[in-house]
């Protein structure tokens, strides 16, 4: 897989521990960078956002639930709906404060406010970070499946994309990737 990623003009690294993964990504990123990050359980497990922030980077979660939690400085409460415990009234108040504009207390307005807030961050980002649902060893291909559009923007707009992928996501062939994804 690593050779095939290199053949596609990418770089691949193997980390045995969370500390090693954070170190590798930290060395690739450096400091004083603007980063947009798509939801990734692997990145969450290794506390990547916090590590990159400690290195002096500005890191923005782009998943709506993760963004809410980042702004509240809270941890996820659920794997699929990380901010399910936060009432929409609290989200409207939070967004109004952070975004310096009145955000109505309805979900559609809150989503629109988050989209507007993140748009500039996508465009200005130096680096986009994501996970991947599946990685194909024979082609070096990554499958990133999403439902909000944030992963597409996080991986496609910044000039650099870093994917943090656990070994359990690696399958031997592209054909098998389609079956598993």
Indicate residue ranges for each PLM-predicted region.
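The feature marks the mature, well-folded catalytic cores of soluble enzymes
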Residues: 1-181
